[in-house]
């Protein structure tokens, strides 16, 4: 979607823009209802696959936001990097995949981590459809036990642990890339100093 929106082909740009604007301009719950009831009408095989319908809705929603994160990350890369790759004989696609995208990953990693955390938390909306997510299990336990708080605290702890682990994983990769940048910058500086001495 990000590459489609940046494409020089107008129909691809239009399609991606329409998709992204529709997803970003409508509530998540509305989209869940649309996929939950609409997909089985289009694909009868999904009639009993309610969990899959909700999963597809979450993926489609997240794709719009992630594509914008990726697009902004790519556009943040110095245009001179791509121009240098093209001057070295790289094709347009190779310059994008082997020069621009690896640098863009460093720019988008924090925002991408936040988006994955949001996906985990948005799964709680699945309880509206009783698809077996954590919030649904909370409702199942709360009914016969008449304990509204204790199961809710446990569900909250589980969600916190999942998002905390995701946050730490993305933070680890971010720090690793920063160290690699500092190391490469230090090596370039050493090389320049040696050249000056020579």
Model-found features: residue ranges?
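Transmembrane alpha-helices and adjacent helix-loop boundaries
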Residues: 1-198
């Amino acid at each position: 979607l990000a590459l489609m929106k940046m494409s020089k082909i107008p129909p691809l740009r239009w399609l991606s823009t329409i998709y992204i604007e529709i997803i970003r301009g409508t509530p998540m719950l509305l989209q869940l209802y649309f996929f939950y009831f609409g997909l089985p009408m289009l694909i009868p095989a999904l009639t009993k696959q309610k969990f899959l319908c909700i999963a597809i809705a979450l993926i489609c929603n997240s794709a719009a936001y992630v594509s914008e994160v990726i697009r902004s990350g790519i556009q943040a890369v110095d245009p001179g990097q791509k121009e240098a790759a093209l001057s070295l004989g790289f094709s347009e696609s190779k310059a994008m995949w082997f020069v621009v995208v690896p640098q863009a990953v460093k720019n988008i990693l924090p925002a991408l981590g936040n988006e994955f955390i949001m996906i985990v938390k948005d799964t709680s909306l699945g309880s509206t459809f009783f698809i077996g997510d954590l919030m649904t299990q909370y409702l199942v336990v709360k009914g016969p036990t008449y304990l509204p708080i204790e199961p809710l605290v446990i569900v909250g702890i589980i969600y916190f642990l999942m998002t905390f682990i995701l946050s730490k994983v993305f933070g680890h990769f971010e720090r690793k890339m920063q160290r690699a940048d500092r190391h490469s910058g230090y090596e370039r500086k050493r090389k320049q100093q040696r050249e000056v001495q020579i």
